[in-house]
Amino acid sequence: MTERLLLILRHAEAGPHLYSGTGDIERPLTPMGHQQVAKIGAQLAKLELPGPVHVLCSPARRTRETAEGVLSALPDAAVPQIESNLYGADLDTLYGFIHATPEDIRTLLLIGHNPAIGTLAHDLAGPALQSDTFAALRHGYAPATLTVFQTQEDWMNIRPSTVRASQVLTP
């Protein structure tokens, strides 16, 4: 069986959209958000992700900036695929993207928004949330949080019982 990694990443800290005139979808990362992205990218680069790597990203500016920053830290940077349905996605939509991933993909990185992206990480982690390794997830899913799941299942069979939460990365 083939080892696969599923990476669930919430975008880094974004500025408020109040009074900006641009609306929610165009909110950029803050200076702190750019620092968070650099830290997560450096940690992700140490994981030696099995390829090919497939990246799905919401069209929101803050997720695109998160993707660009994180992927620039990887030796073989993947090009993010912008998926409009990731913006405002629910849990079923996120599982749909995972299940539709081509079988030759060894690492899938989903970059999205709360509440759905955090709900997905919590759903997949299940009882692992009780361990000290995942203490950071007990009180929400903070910006730039990335959870790594391992599996040997085909993407279409991904569910809480077929993955193992291996680590959580925070800036």
For each predicted feature, which ranges?
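Short secondary-structure boundary/capping segments
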Residues: 21, 72, 100, 138-139, ...
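Glycine-rich phosphate-binding loop signature in dinucleotide/nucleotide-binding domains
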Residues: 47-50, 101-106
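Short, surface-exposed amphipathic charged segments that create phosphate/polyanion-binding patches used
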Residues: 95-101
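A glycine-rich beta-strand to alpha-helix segment
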Residues: 105-125
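Domain-level recognition of soluble alpha/beta enzyme cores
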Residues: 125-163, 170
